[in-house]
């Protein structure tokens, strides 16, 4: 580490100017814990102006503060570098000029104590003297070596012996493929499907691949295309089940609910509900003309007595959850506002400006809807009643091959329905990893139970052990996150894992945009995923990082499989991989202690094929354990 040096005259003058502005900011925003985060000096229209970036916009005689994340001109700080030009849109105006200086500020008790500018950190000691040293708090994003810039796709790799044995099992043998992230579970599952298709030869043949997320569905379609396998139905479970249910049960509402409470979803997906259904199915149908229909769902979920029976069977579903189901069901069986006006009212006069229903966004927004979770419930009630009557139940479409990927996210009734989709003599392929089970409502127990639910108690289990995606240090860190007893790797500054600790969101956005901008120059074909804990956080990071670099918000599976930066959430990235992964909220608030947080962080970090970067504006999540930088080492660890 270099010895700090004294400041030259120009540096002293700049620090003095910024200190004066910071003092004025403290006077302008006396209640703000941090009245300013950064300094921006621009030249526009022949004049030089100084601005501070802070928590809100303030215009005064002594200082102008721009809200850092919203003010149009503040975008020049993120979109340009010192000495560069900027051009920004502000409504119907264009703001243009040149950035003369930009720096990140550190305040203590309202006074400027440090700033970073152009790779140099200026700090004031206890005696008020300033010194300069290299800025070490840079975003640790590094380009891939040339050898890793054109890796083969997941289906183009040569299988190892263990993977090949799984692919070569005879048709009709149910296969369970397990293993941690990056070991090739999806590769094996799809290669087995391709091998079965080739062995089948000419003649009718059908297959389906069912996945939990839209992003994985789109990736699977692309991988099958590369394998040259045609005619495979690739769907998310929700869309697959919806299509089947609408064919089988004709009184299902057109709309699906958007605001079902988490507790209601948890109860409807729990095994305890499946255990109660035989008694409910023994009752006469609510509609004598149908073996089962929507009115049966009303009698089941709208009756607190039945919901109390579910609660009595498990500690994982609460009376509060049952109450949420009851309240949600009551709304679902109400008329919509549009319907309440009757047929005599012109529907065009009821149209809203945004095209949504009148009830949307209100407590009655789910009126006249069905829950996605109801589809499997309907099929199970129908199956039970058909069996009691000696009749044929409503059947899902049957396939010669059914592949379930990330199957740990499927609930018991969903698995039962999917198991019925395998044709007699057909082949079931199941891939999953309990360590990546992030949907708290899925009710995953263990793999033997899941395979019984699928009707495949007899199956071949293959556990893959070699990770092909992640660097060994990333794999070791992921194991440590999932299981604290697993040793943390010794992470060096030149390794595949980086840490970036910032004192606020503005600093974090600036550090990451600078790092992403440099990476785009050094490794323009790299794919980067900024994986936030939630969708709301992903939208926030897409907005603030998008002020400086091109960032694509990828939610609801809307991924671009190629170079560029995408902001998304943990739930979206199952089964996907990127060259670089940034976890921008690796704090104890986003990832608290507990199994759910551990699995979520594990999923995020194991998406990285080259480098994983953790960033935070608060305390590091305890889930990083011994791998997290110590407070005393934080500056040195952020390189």
Kindly give the residue locations of the regions a language model identified.
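A structural signal for short, well-ordered beta-strand segments and their strand-loop junctions
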Residues: 39-41, 114, 176, 430, ...
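Extended, charged low-complexity regulatory segments
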Residues: 1-156, 160, 164-165, 393, ...
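Phosphate/oxyanion-binding active-site loops and adjacent basic polyanion-contact surfaces
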Residues: 151, 155, 185-189, 370-377, ...
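Short, hydrophobic/proline-enriched secondary-structure or compact coil segments at domain edges
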Residues: 36-42, 375-382, 531
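Generic alpha-helical structural element
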Residues: 7, 144, 148, 209, ...
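P-loop NTPase Walker
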Residues: 102, 108-115, 120, 124-254, ...
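Conserved helicase motor core of SF1/SF2 NTP-dependent helicases
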Residues: 205, 214-218, 222, 226-242, ...
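Alpha-helical nucleic-acid-binding subdomain
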Residues: 194-404, 408-420, 426, 435
């Amino acid at each position: 580490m270099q010895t700090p040096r004294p400041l030259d005259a120009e540096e002293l003058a700049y620090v003095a100017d910024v200190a004066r502005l910071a003092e004025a900011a403290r006077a302008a925003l006396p209640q703000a814990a941090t009245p300013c985060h950064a300094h921006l000096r621009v030249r526009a229209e022949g004049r030089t102006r100084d601005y501070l970036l802070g928590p809100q916009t303030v215009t005064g005689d002594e200082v102008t503060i721009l809200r850092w994340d919203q003010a149009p001109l503040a975008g020049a700080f993120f979109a340009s570098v010192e000495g560069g030009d900027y051009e920004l849109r502000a409504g119907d105006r264009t703001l243009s000029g040149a950035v003369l200086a930009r720096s990140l500020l550190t305040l203590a008790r309202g006074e400027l104590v440090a700033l970073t500018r152009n790779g140099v950190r200026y700090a004031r000691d206890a005696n008020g003297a300033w010194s300069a040293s290299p800025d070490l708090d840079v975003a640790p994003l590094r380009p891939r070596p040339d050898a890793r810039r054109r890796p083969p796709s997941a289906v183009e790799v040569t299988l190892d012996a263990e993977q090949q044995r799984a692919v070569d099992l005879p048709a009709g043998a149910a296969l369970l493929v397990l293993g941690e992230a990056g070991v090739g579970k999806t590769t094996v599952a799809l290669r087995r499907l391709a091998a079965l298709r080739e062995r089948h030869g000419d003649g009718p043949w059908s297959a389906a691949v069912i996945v939990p997320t839209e992003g994985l569905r789109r990736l699977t379609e692309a991988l099958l295309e590369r394998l040259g396998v045609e005619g495979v139905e690739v769907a998310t479970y929700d869309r697959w089940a919806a299509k089947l249910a609408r064919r089988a049960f004709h009184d299902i509402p057109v709309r699906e609910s958007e605001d079902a409470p988490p507790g209601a979803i948890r109860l409807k997906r729990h095994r305890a509900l499946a255990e109660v259904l035989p008694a409910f199915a023994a009752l006469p149908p609510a509609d004598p003309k149908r073996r089962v229909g929507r009115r049966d769902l009303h009698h089941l979920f709208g009756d607190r007595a039945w919901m109390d029976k579910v609660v009595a069977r498990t500690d994982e579903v609460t009376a509060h959850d049952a109450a949420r189901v009851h309240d949600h069901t009551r709304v679902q069986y109400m008329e919509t506002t549009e319907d309440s006006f009757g047929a005599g009212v012109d529907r065009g006069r009821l149209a809203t400006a945004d095209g949504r229903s009148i009830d949307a966004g209100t407590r009655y927004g789910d009126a006249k809807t069905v829950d996605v979770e109801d589809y499997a419930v309907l099929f199970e009630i129908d199956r039970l009643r058909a069996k009691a009557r000696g009749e044929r139940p409503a059947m899902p479409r049957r396939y010669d091959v059914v592949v379930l990927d990330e199957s740990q996210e499927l609930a018991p009734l969903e698995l039962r329905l999917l198991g019925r989709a395998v044709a007699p003599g057909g082949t079931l392929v199941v891939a999953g990893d309990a360590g990546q089970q992030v949907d708290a409502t899925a009710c995953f127990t263990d793999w033997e139970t899941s395979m019984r639910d699928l009707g495949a108690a007899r199956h071949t289990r293959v556990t893959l052990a070699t990770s092909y995606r992640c660097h060994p240090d990333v794999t070791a860190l992921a194991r440590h996150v999932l299981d604290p007893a697993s040793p943390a790797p010794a992470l060096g500054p030149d390794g595949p894992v980086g840490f970036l600790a910032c004192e606020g969101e503005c600093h974090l956005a600036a550090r990451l945009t600078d790092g992403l901008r440099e990476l785009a120059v050094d490794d323009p074909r790299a794919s980067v995923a900024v994986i936030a804990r939630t969708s709301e956080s992903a939208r926030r990071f897409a907005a603030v990082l998008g002020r400086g670099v091109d960032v694509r918000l990828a939610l609801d599976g809307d991924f671009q499989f190629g170079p560029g930066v995408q902001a998304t959430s943990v739930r979206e990235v199952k089964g996907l991989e990127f060259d670089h992964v940034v976890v921008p909220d690796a704090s104890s608030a986003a990832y608290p202690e507990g199994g759910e947080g551990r699995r979520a962080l594990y999923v995020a970090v194991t998406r990285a094929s080259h480098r994983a970067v953790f960033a935070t504006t608060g305390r590091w999540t305890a889930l990083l354990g011994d791998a997290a930088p110590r407070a005393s080492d934080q500056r040195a660890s952020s390189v």
